[in-house]
C-alpha cells in the first residue's frame, strides 16, 4: 500500500502553497569585552553578520531544496530588507509572483 502511494506521488508531485509571514533573520556574531557604563548591557564587537530567509521563507526554501513544487504567498515592505528577501527567493528559483510589496509596512526582521 505504501509503495502505491509513493508511486502516485512520483507520477504527479504535489504543489504546496506556503502562506505566512516572510521575514528576514539576522545573525550577528561578535565578542564581548565589557559592559556598558550607562546600562547593564554588553558591548559587542561585531565580527560578522549573516542574513537569511526566515518564517515562511525558511519553509519554502526547505521545500525547494527537497525538490517540492511550491509557491509562496506573503507580504513584505518596499524596503532594503524586502529587496534582500526577494533577491534570496529569486536566487533559489522560488516563485515570487504572489509576494506583495507594500510601502505602508516595514519588512519584519528578527535578530
Regions found by a protein language model. Name each.
Residues 2-4, 8, 14-15, 37, ...:
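Substrate-binding N-lobe of the ribokinase-like
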Residues 1-33:
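Positively charged, low-complexity intrinsically disordered leader regions
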Amino acid at each position: 500500500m505504501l509503495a502505491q502511494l509513493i508511486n502516485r506521488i512520483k507520477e504527479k508531485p504535489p504543489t504546496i502553497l506556503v502562506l505566512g509571514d516572510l521575514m528576514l533573520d539576522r545573525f550577528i556574531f561578535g565578542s564581548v569585552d565589557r559592559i556598558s557604563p550607562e546600562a547593564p548591557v554588553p558591548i559587542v564587537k561585531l565580527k560578522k553578520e549573516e542574513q537569511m530567509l526566515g518564517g515562511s521563507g525558511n519553509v519554502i526554501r526547505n521545500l525547494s531544496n527537497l525538490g517540492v513544487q511550491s509557491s509562496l504567498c506573503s507580504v513584505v515592505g518596499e524596503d532594503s530588507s524586502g529587496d534582500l528577501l526577494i533577491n534570496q527567493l529569486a536566487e533559489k528559483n522560488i516563485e515570487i509572483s504572489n509576494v506583495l510589496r507594500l510601502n505602508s509596512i516595514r519588512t519584519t526582521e528578527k535578530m
